From Swiss-Prot:
Signal sequence annotation: none
Comp. bias regions, Low complexity: 179-190, 597-627
Species this protein is from: Arabidopsis thaliana (Mouse-ear cress)
Subcellular location: Nucleus
Compositional bias (Basic and acidic residues): 586-596
Protein name as it appears in the record: BEL1-like homeodomain protein 2
Span list, region SR/KY domain: 316-332
SS bonds (residue pairs): none
Cited SMART domains: HOX (SM00389), POX (SM00574)
Any one of the GO CC terms: nucleus
A molecular-function term among this protein's GO annotations: DNA-binding transcription factor activity
Length: 739
């Protein structure tokens, strides 16, 4: 079967051409190793190996070559390993059950010859052929992973394998002259083409374990680890890397991270330095910690899928725009530092623009050419004043923005808790600070150019100089500008063409002063600091500002205040007049109501007197009677006022209810036959039909009708006790038809 004999102490599995038998042996030993605590363990250290000296490495190289030749002669043929199962069998040797456990490989690391001698001592029953075959197999595996020699002719890499605290014979096959222990080893494969004819330049071998402990070479969902054999590029060697990952995707991600951040030129840097950088980058991602570290320590090589995607992204035409956009809004500090580095390396005058570039020429012009004319100097002076105003405005706007942002942060923190707004506002504040800084630098550069043209050397360093003895560059510049203006006005250096005589102050200055006046309308008295600031903003002197405010308070502010007071007094007078008119109207209305009431009472009284004096002998029709009853009902309140009068006994005072006429008519209809009867109301005070007042007592009752009784009773007045007349005193008229 191509499997060498094994002893109780050490088991060496060599797979030649049959995958089936080796998979069964792998399953057996893999199951045995799982009960012993896993295939192999890793410590938490990540140390670099100590490089041995040149003499020791040369001796070991000669020893390996000699033993390889002896094993090839003794064994007859060198066992050939297939790429599919070779690495999986390498890392599945069971621990020795006999004297092999007495070997403590973690305490001391021996050389190749010492390890092989101990191996031969632990296998006394092995014959010469088996021993030679085992030695050849051991050297074959050892040559696959040699220690890193330092001489230039050797094609070995820079990393070396180290042994671990494990009882497996894998460490016997992989000796190392170094002394320290580590985890996540990276093994390099440097076999020649005649030793491994079927070995490719880049191979990936995986060992897998399913829950039912059956080994599947291709269709398994649970992957224990990955082994990557990668080509290192121009060095001509191959690199072997180990990683503990759940799938090959994690290893591909780690390779992608390494290629993105460090590129193909990362082989020039030391692996230890790369590891430190990558460890700080992925400090919080504990899930991919082990697999990423292994992939990072491996030799740099471009993976097919990840590097293709990265190259597509890098070569895209949208990459530059996206990077600028991200640097503008996300990577604020890094972009600013990049620009500073580029400016310092390539062109130190990029920020200043034309100002920085023209400073030597302006200095040369000042030296070679005559100074500026008065008109040009005045123009540059105005420009300098405007730039100073802009600089002040930028500072004021930035302070205002910071205050507004702080208000928003405070309100958000009150609702969500302290520090809740920091992740959202910190980036915005940095971005806005960067914008304001760029704007301020541009204004400062233009101001520096103007100052250099004017010959103000002290003011040229306005953006860089600091506080000296209580004075600032702005105050010094202000003082110089005021001195120059005063000197120009006094000495008469200004030409008439450049400074035409004008009436009053400039309109821009007047607008600034007027705006300040209206902002402080309640107290238009600027302090000394306000006068200095206004003088700097308007380009005027302090005396001009003071005189303007004196005149403005007299000519503008005082008339406006007086006009406001006059308007208020007029409005008050109008309100008082309206109130008086309303009161007069109310009094007039009340008087009119009283007069109308008295007039109504008088008219009612006269009407009653006249009706009492005129006898009624005719009865109107039913409608006239109803109207008369209604008018009597309406005037009963007025008539009640005269109940105490002598004639009140003859007048009706009230009715039983509002429906009295209807009740009276119903009563008459029930008593006197309905349609044949009629009623009339008449008040008689004098004689009626030949009867005198003496014959009429109280209320006179007049009865008309065609009934057999022929009586119609009409009552005038109330039915008080003693107010009803006797039956004998009633006046009856019989046999009268309809009137």
């Amino acid at each position: 079967m191509g499997i060498t004999k094994t002893s109780p102490n050490t088991t060496i599995l060599l797979k030649t051409f049959h995958n089936n038998s080796m998979s069964q042996d792998y399953h057996h030993h893999h199951h045995h190793n799982q009960h012993q605590g896993g295939i192999f363990n890793f410590s938490n250290g990540f140390d670099r190996s100590d490089s041995p000296n040149l003499t020791t490495q040369q001796k070991q190289e000669h020893q390996r070559v000699e033993m390889d030749e002896e094993s090839s002669v003794a064994g007859g043929r060198i066992p050939v390993y297939e790429s599919a199962g070779m690495l999986s069998e390498m890392f599945n040797f069971p621990g020795s059950s006999g004297g092999g456990r007495d070997l403590d490989l973690g305490q001391s690391f021996r050389s190749n010859r010492q390890l092989l001698e101990e191996q031969h001592q632990n296998i006394p029953a092995m014959n010469a052929t088996d021993s030679a075959t085992a030695t050849a197999a051991a050297m074959q595996l050892f040559l696959m992973n040699p220690p890193p020699p330092q001489q230039p002719p050797s094609p070995s890499s820079t990393t070396s394998p180290r042994s671990h605290h494990n009882s497996s014979t894998l460490h016997m096959l992989l000796p190392s002259p170094s002394t320290n222990t580590t985890h996540h080893q990276n093994y390099t494969n440097h076999m020649s083409m005649h030793q491994l004819p079927h070995q490719h330049h880049q191979q990936i071998s995986t060992w897998q374990s399913s829950p039912d402990h059956h080994h599947h070479h291709h269709n398994s969902q649970t992957e224990i680890g990955t082994v990557h054999v990668e080509n290192s590029g121009g060095h001509g060697g191959q690199g072997l890397s180990l990683s503990l990952s759940s799938s090959l995707e994690a290893a591909a991600k780690a390779e992608e991270y390494r290629n993105i951040y460090y590129g193909a030129n990362s082989s020039n840097a030391s692996p230890h330095h790369q590891y430190n950088q990558f460890k700080t980058l992925l400090a919080n991602s504990s899930q991919h910690h082990h697999q990423v570290l292994n992939q990072f320590r491996s030799s740099p090589a471009a993976s097919s899928s990840s590097m293709a995607a990265v190259n597509i992204l890098r070569n895209s035409r949208y990459t530059t725009a996206a990077q600028e956009l991200l640097e503008e809004f996300c990577s604020v500090g890094r972009g600013f530092l990049k620009k500073n580095k580029l400016g310092n390396s390539s062109n130190p005058n990029t920020c200043g623009g034309d100002g920085g570039g023209s400073s030597p020429s302006s200095a040369g012009a000042n030296k070679e050419h005559p100074p500026l004319s008065a008109s040009d100097r005045i123009e540059h002076q105005r420009r300098k004043v405007k730039l100073l105003t802009m600089l002040e405005e930028v500072d004021r706007r930035y302070n205002h923005y910071c205050e507004q942002m702080q208000m928003v942060v405070n309100s958000f923190d009150i609702v969500m808790g302290h520090g809740a707004a920091l992740p959202y506002t910190a980036l915005a504040q940095k971005a806005m600070s960067r914008h304001f800084r760029c704007l301020k630098d541009a204004v400062a550069a233009q101001l520096k150019q103007s100052c250099e043209l004017l010959g103000d050397k002290d003011a040229a360093g306005i953006s860089s100089s600091g506080l000296t003895k209580g004075e600032t560059p702005r105050l010094r510049l202000l003082e110089q500008s005021l001195r120059q203006n005063r000197a120009f006005h006094q000495m008469g250096m200004m030409e008439q063409e450049a400074w035409r005589p004008q009436r009053g102050l400039p309109e821009r200055s007047v607008n600034i002063l007027r705006a300040w006046l209206f902002e402080h309308f309640l107290h238009p008295y600027p302090s000394d600091a306000d006068k200095h600031l206004l003088a700097r903003q308007t380009g005027l002197s302090r005396n001009q500002v003071s005189n303007w405010f004196i005149n403005a308070r007299v000519r503008l502010w005082k008339p406006m205040v007086e006009e406001m007071y006059q308007q208020e007094s007029k409005e008050r007078e109008r309100e008082e007049e309206l109130e008086e008119n309303e009161e007069d109207q109310e009094t007039k209305n009340s008087n009119d109501d009283k007069s109308t009431k008295s007039n109504n009472n008088e008219s009612n009284f006269t009407a009653v007197r006249t009706t009492s004096q005129t006898p009624t002998t005719t009865a109107p029709d039913a409608s006239d009677a109803d109207a008369a009853v209604a008018t009597g009902h309406r005037l009963r309140s007025n008539i009640n006022a005269y109940e105490n009068d002598a004639s009140s006994l003859l007048l009706p005072s009230s009715y039983s209810n509002a429906a009295a006429p209807a009740a009276v008519s119903d009563d008459l209809n029930s008593r006197y036959g309905g349609s044949d009867a009629f009623s009339a109301v008449a008040t008689c005070q004098q004689s009626v039909g030949g009867f005198d007042d003496a014959d009429m007592d109280g209320v006179n009752v007049i009865r008309f009708g065609t009934n057999p009784t022929g009586d119609v009773s009409l009552t005038l007045g109330l039915r008080h006790a003693g107010n009803m007349p006797d039956k004998d005193a009633s006046f009856c008229v019989r046999e009268f038809g309809g009137f």
